[in-house]
Amino acid sequence: MAAGRPVRGPELAPRRLLQLLLLVLLGGRGRGAALSGNVTGPGPRSAGGSARRNAPVTSPPPPLLSHCGRAAHCEPLRYNVCLGSALPYGATTTLLAGDSDSQEEAHSKLVLWSGLRNAPRCWAVIQPLLCAVYMPKCENDRVELPSRTLCQATRGPCAIVERERGWPDFLRCTPDHFPEGCPNEVQNIKFNSSGQCEAPLVRTDNPKSWYEDVEGCGIQCQNPLFTEAEHQDMHSYIAAFGAVTGLCTLFTLATFVADWRNSNRYPAVILFYVNACFFVGSIGWLAQFMDGARREIVCRADGTMRFGEPTSSETLSCVIIFVIVYYALMAGVVWFVVLTYAWHTSFKALGTTYQPLSGKTSYFHLLTWSLPFVLTVAILAVAQVDGDSVSGICFVGYKNYRYRAGFVLAPIGLVLIVGGYFLIRGVMTLFSIKSNHPGLLSEKAASKINETMLRLGIFGFLAFGFVLITFSCHFYDFFNQAEWERSFRDYVLCQANVTIGLPTKKPIPDCEIKNRPSLLVEKINLFAMFGTGIAMSTWVWTKATLLIWRRTWCRLTGHSDDEPKRIKKSKMIAKAFSKRRELLQNPGQELSFSMHTVSHDGPVAGLAFELNEPSADVSSAWAQHVTKMVARRGAILPQDVSVTPVATPVPPEEQANLWLVEAEISPELEKRLGRKKKRRKRKKEVCPLGPAPELHHSAPVPATSAVPRLPQLPRQKCLVAANAWGTGEPCRQGAWTVVSNPFCPEPSPHQDPFLPGASAPRVWAQGRLQGLGSIHSRTNLMEAELLDADSDF
């Protein structure tokens, strides 16, 4: 039988049986013995027969089907072990291995294929296939063909082979190489399926952690693109800048709280919320430095890197840190837009009583807290939260940069456009006020405008700079991420010795990652984020902040504050009006002002422009006479009279009063005033001494009106006006005017012209004694009328 000739299994037994029958008929003992030895094996016939009789009876192997075998030249095995497992047969052939011509070459190829040991799930199914192809069972010049099922079982777990190198032709599951339904001796061999994962991969049974086509292995938690030293350097950098940002923003928050009564004003209070957002964000960055927190945040339980969070099988530490950092960041940038809008509208309303932000604050809060919430929920819904061991936090889009562009760069870019527009318009408004209306500004207001314009310019420059830095760093990541992934994949394949299809005996070179991200770019990106928080806190780095903490310290320690207080005139007048009952009973009472009445700047100095008040300083003389001034203006009455009574009150009983003054305009003067309407002065003259005339109300009684009238007030001693007649002319009757004023000076007998014994008449002019200093004539009581009369300023 020629080698290589196809032999059919069922024809072999009848042919040998025919040869034995011929030998028996011919009677050739020796020849029969020789033939029997060739068939059964070497040695004497009796020994061979005894061995066969004593051997255990085993079931014969199933007959080899015609399509499951192929004629081949069988060779004795030189390697009895295939991929660490012993072979149960003693002959093989290299006919099926298309890349090997000898057993030595086939063995070297198996060593190369053993690199798939680093893909555990692939290694468990590919070992039988490799042994069935490179070291098949060969018997009687016939080789067993592996089944198609054995070949197809490797396609899924070993997809990395097809993706990286492609399967060789002799390992493709074609019918001529892998027929259907063929049993194979190799399938009964027990192989070691406990594969291992070469660093930077780790063994895991979680399909969500598998690295692309390497089933059974996932990327280690520590980012392999950076070294251990780079990790430590970045962690120290984050600790330093995160702590500085946290302290700066915390100081800003404490300053606002220490003087919340004066600080809780828009737009300055918006900086409080901005700093609160960056403070919470810095807490999220610094949480990784707690004992074991970083591994809990960025690593899964199997030691692989977190990505695609949230998942039901892992803890919520990664999600919590993401929500803290991302929500705080987005809320902070939205508050920045609100801040620039508030600045713009407030600057436009300078010099007027219009409050542009009144009624809009609730909408500010609704916008700034709800928009980041919607973005956060959307990210969690698509499960795109990834961990990063370098930064130590979980954030959106570390693995898929498209989500980072949509949920980070797009909102920040929109903020840059909208906030920049309002910021530029606000600065232009201040410049217009300063240049077009210089006469309306006091020196202090002009100085504040210059200071605010400078600070807004610096702040805007820093904000634009930090945003541009953030965009540049992210674009650097986006453009190079594909190259970094290819370099990492080559590194993984090199570590796993996956060099399929390379018939070479050269040693495998050292593996290294050729292209890696720059640690400097990562530091610059973090500096831009932390620097924005620090820039937001600089708005309270003013002298007003030092004064606030000085007052707070004095209040906590009980010491007196020697700082001179500034009180607004309008608040002093309102205070006097609110204390009208006490002042009516005790005209000499002095007003006391609490610390809440004192007017001082909040921590964000430079944003409150008092364009209508040239100076906030109040002289001591003005402060001492404020009660008398309010009384002379008619703000303090002898009894509490409602401004808008609900009904016509009953007038009090009239009592005779000797201290009355007649006043009337002469007919000649009345004509002159009617013609020209320019001269409005009246002549005054004190009535001659003598008994006071009786009251005669010659004026007609007004008709009944539905409009409520004020009650008639009791007449008291007070000089309010003098008659307009010439000297020596007798007083005329009628048109009496009585106004109560408890603060008029009480005249003595030798001074008052109305009492007997007075030496000389006293000259009065427009309700005051001649020679006394004038009382301030332009005082705005609007604020006093609007404020609560019983409130404490």
Curated annotation (Swiss-Prot):
Residue segments, region Disordered: 35-61, 674-702
Membrane topology: Multi-pass membrane protein
Subcellular location: Cell membrane; Cell projection, Cilium
Cytoplasmic compartment segments: 259-266, 340-362, 428-455, 550-793
Organism: Rattus norvegicus (Rat)
Modified residues (Phosphoserine): S560, S578, S594, S599, S642, S666
Cysteine disulfide partners in this protein: C68-C182, C74-C138, C82-C131, C122-C158, C151-C173, C197-C217, C221-C299, C318-C394, C494-C511
SMART domains recorded: FRI, Frizzled
Keyword line: Cell membrane, Cell projection, Developmental protein, Disulfide bond, G-protein coupled receptor, Glycoprotein, Membrane, Phosphoprotein, Receptor, Signal, Transducer, Transmembrane, Transmembrane helix
Modifications the protein undergoes after translation, according to the UniProt entry: Phosphorylation by GRK kinases is required for interaction with protein kinase A catalytic subunit PRKACA.
Tissue-specific expression: In embryo, found in the early neural folds and neural tube, pre-somitic mesoderm and somites, developing limb bud, gut, eye, testes, cartilage, muscle, lung, epiglottis, thymus, tongue, jaw, taste buds, teeth, and skin. In adult, found in multiple tissues including heart, brain, liver, lung, skeletal muscle, kidney and testis.
Role: G protein-coupled receptor which associates with the patched protein (PTCH) to transduce hedgehog protein signaling. Binding of sonic hedgehog (SHH) to its receptor patched prevents inhibition of smoothened (SMO) by patched. When active, SMO binds to and sequesters protein kinase A catalytic subunit PRKACA at the cell membrane, preventing PRKACA-mediated phosphorylation of GLI transcription factors which releases the GLI proteins from PRKACA-mediated inhibition and allows for transcriptional activation of hedgehog pathway target genes.
Domain notes per entry: The N-terminal extracellular domain mediates sterol-binding which is required for maximal activation of signaling. Contains a second sterol-binding site within the seven-transmembrane pocket which is also required for activation. The activating sterol is likely to be cholesterol. The extracellular site is required for SHH-induced activity while the site within the transmembrane pocket regulates basal signaling in the absence of SHH.
Protein's name according to its UniProt entry: Protein smoothened
Assembly notes: Homodimer. Interacts (via C-terminus) with protein kinase A catalytic subunit PRKACA; interacts with free PRKACA subunits and the interaction leads to sequestration of PRKACA at the membrane, preventing PRKACA-mediated phosphorylation of GLI transcription factors. Interacts with ARRB2. Interacts with KIF7. Interacts with BBS5 and BBS7; the interactions are indicative for the association of SMO with the BBsome complex to facilitate ciliary localization of SMO. Interacts with DLG5 and SDCBP. Interacts with GAS8/DRC4.
PROSITE patterns tied to this protein: FZ, G_PROTEIN_RECEP_F2_4
Location of Phosphothreonine modifications: T597, T644, T648
Signal sequence interval, chain numbering: 1-30
Record bears the keyword Cell membrane: yes
Glycosylation site positions: N38, N192, N497
GO (cellular component) term, any one: caveola
Molecular function GO terms recorded: cAMP-dependent protein kinase inhibitor activity; G protein-coupled receptor activity; oxysterol binding; patched binding; protein kinase A catalytic subunit binding; protein sequestering activity
Pfam family, one: Fz
Residues covered by the FZ domain: 69-185
Coiled coil: none
